[in-house]
Amino acid sequence: MNQTVKAKKKKKTITLGVVHIRASFNNTIVTFTDVQGNAISSASAGANGFKGAKKATPYAAQITIDKAAEKAKEYGLKTISIRIGGPGAQRESAMRALFGQNFVVTSILDVSSIAHNGVKAPKRRRV
C-alpha cells in the first residue's frame, strides 16, 4: 500500500489586478480579477449574510469589499484598476472601502450601461 505524495499546488502571485464592482438597486457584487479577466476572488452582499433590502445598503457594500479584498491579498495583489458599474447607492461607499484596503489604485472607470432608447423601461411602482 504505497501512497504517492502529491506536491502542494503552488498559489499564483498576482500583483496587478482589476476590481469589478456591480452596484445594482438590490445587491452589490465585487469580483477581483487578473488583467486577463480570470477571477481571483468574489463576494456579494447576499453571500455575506445580508437579506432583502439590507443587501442594497452602503454598509453591506463595505463589508463585501472587505471580504473580497481579504481573499485577493492572499494572492499578493497590490495594484488595482477599478471598474464600477450600476445605478446603486452603494457605489461611493464601495470606493471608500477599497481605498481603505491599502491598494495602489491606477485607474477608476465607470462602466455603467446607458440605454440609448433601446428596450422600454419597466413601469413605475405605485406604493
From Swiss-Prot:
Keyword S-adenosyl-L-methionine: no
Keyword Ribonucleoprotein applies: yes
Free-text function comment from the UniProt entry: Located on the platform of the 30S subunit, it bridges several disparate RNA helices of the 16S rRNA. Forms part of the Shine-Dalgarno cleft in the 70S ribosome.
Gene3D superfamilies referenced in this protein's UniProt entry, alphabetically: Ribosomal protein S11
Any one GO CC term of the record: ribonucleoprotein complex
Keywords from the named record: Ribonucleoprotein, Ribosomal protein, RNA-binding, rRNA-binding
Origin superkingdom: Bacteria
Naturally occurring in which organism (per UniProt): Rickettsia bellii (strain OSU 85-389)
Protein's UniProt name: Small ribosomal subunit protein uS11
Stored PROSITE patterns: RIBOSOMAL_S11
PANTHER family the record matches: 40S RIBOSOMAL PROTEIN S14/30S RIBOSOMAL PROTEIN S11
Quaternary context: Part of the 30S ribosomal subunit. Interacts with proteins S7 and S18. Binds to IF-3.
One Gene Ontology molecular-function label: structural constituent of ribosome
Family, as annotated: Belongs to the universal ribosomal protein uS11 family.
Gene Ontology BP annotations: translation
